[in-house]
Amino acid sequence: MSDSISRPSIPRRPKKQLQVDLPNHSEGFDRSDTESDNEQMVSLESLESNEASDKIPVIPKRPDRSKSSSKSPSLPAIPKRPQKSDTSGVESPSPSDLPEVENEEENHKSIYDESVSSKKHSDDAIEPPESSEFNYEVGDRSDVDVSDGDKTPGNTNTKTSIKEDLNITDDNSMHSFDDDLETVLQDRDDNGSSSIGPEISQDNNVPSSSESDINAELGEEYTDPDSNSQKSCGNRDKENDELSTESDKRNPNERDQSNKSEEKTIKKDQEVSNTPKVTDAEASEDRDSDNIPHIPRRPKKSKSATSEPDAKSIEVENLDNTNIIDQKQTQTNKDNNEEAYSINETSESKSETPQQEKNTTKPKAPPKPKKLSSKIAAFQQMFNQETAPPRNSGTSKSTSKPDLETKNSENKEVPSRLSTDKMKFAQSLQGMMGKGIAMPGMVNPNFHQKIDTEEIESPDKEVKISNMKRGIAKGPRGKKLPKSLKNPVNVEVTPRFNSFVSTIWELNFQADTKSNDMEGSENVSNNTEAQKSENNEEILNLENKSEYIMDSESVSNSTPASDIKEIREESSPLKIDDDDVYSEIDKSKTTQSESRNLESIDSTEGSRNIDAENLPEEIKSDNDSAASYPKKSEDSDLDLDDNEQHILENQESDLNLRKED
């Protein structure tokens, strides 16, 4: 087991050789550099003192930072390290170191498990000088990290050294320390929670040595390396004892895991150890040298040591908080489930109670039917009944349902072929189904219902009208209308037009009008005949008298055309109207005119016959002209009607006949 423990420390020894060679070159530098070197030496001293307390598995994370420093772009700052005093001068790592560091990064957890398992077996498995040199190498790499500034999270020792360097350089850059806390939590989850207790106990032992180191740093005095090395060895022995006791308490499962991890790390370390064999041999020789006192000069380990228990306490508190939160969540879930269960119970209980109430209300008997005094009562009765709502009017339903009940009561003795369920179903369909369509010649089945409803509704309406009370329209009290408004006003409208009533025409329906006309015509004819006879007698008497004989000149002068015309107009015995009816004729006028005409005619004829022979030729010509004058006038001036000419012709014919007789 001792060989297996020494193998993981092999890659870290070559830097021990660099540290031994560098102090010879660092004698002629300033005091400022020596002070910083002293501080770093004190930090190394604190690392050596707390190695056992912080467990060896913390160591492998230092090489990670050396790798980052070697690969970082800040490599030009490396040559300044040899200026430091005897404490620790660091050069850039050789190319042979880089693969070692990479392997260490991959296997830092396996080394951690191997170191723990080695402490289980024996306290003498780890030699104090080897462990001191191992920590010294870690300190040198931490110095490189301070210059470069690129840091990766590591275990507890790396955390403390990082925090110390950050406090020296920048007080504000604390992000790397926070990252280390997260890595610690992850490591504990992987390795188990059993390692929390021993780490806390180890950290409690650290501050005593760290405080003394801090005082030495403040006074800038260097303590003897031998005394510090002895103290560190004593502390290691105590820590190994504690680790052995704690390892016995661990579960067997953890031991199996640690054994497996050791086997893996051994294989990887063998591959790594093939290249740096020379450096390991030189480092083993340097361990025996007296330059080891540089290790105990890390006093600022105390600050990190004090911070570690704080971090551990924070982790414990976090775990407690998580447990408390889980408990609270479980309690809240339980409470929610209980509340939901209680709500469901209450809802079920509420739903059950109305069902029970409904069940209790169903068996109650319906109220006694009352006489239907109005439609409202019939409407209420329809709702009280449990049957389905039919389509017909409420009154017909209300009348039909009691009839069904009476029929059922009468037919109780007769066993029904249908079951009770079917009977109920049929009763419920009575109002829903129609009576069908009436065939031709049949009476409409709904006609009787309409008649019944009208008969029932008519007395109700009459009663309502008789019971109605008219509201009295009351005007505003305490006010009276003026008299001008109380008395009625008669408005008379005068029409625009004056209307006159008169009979414009009449119709007389007489059947004897034609007979009267015929009689009138006969009378006229008789009168004319009598007149003609009388005229003839007068003419005969006048022929015998000479008084009526006149000269042709006197006749011609006395009878102008106008007089002749008037005479003929007056001598006309008849006057014919537009209706071809004879008017009354004055007999006296006709007789006188006729007599005058006859006399004038006779006188003219006699004068012509008598005087024509005795007169001279000059006179004859004059007489002829005078005699012809009246004829011309008669022809030219007299324009007689056809009737008048006819009468004259008749007269002349009569006269001629008489003369012949």
Swiss-Prot record:
It is found in: Cytoplasm, Cytoskeleton, Actin patch. Transmembrane segments: none annotated. Keywords: Cytoplasm, Cytoskeleton. It comes from the Eukaryota. Residues 106-124, 138-151, 161-178, 234-271, 400-421, 454-464, 563-576, 643-661 have a biased composition (Basic and acidic residues). Involved in mitochondrial migration along actin filaments. This is Altered inheritance of mitochondria protein 21. The lineage of its organism: Eukaryota, Fungi, Dikarya, Ascomycota, Saccharomycotina.
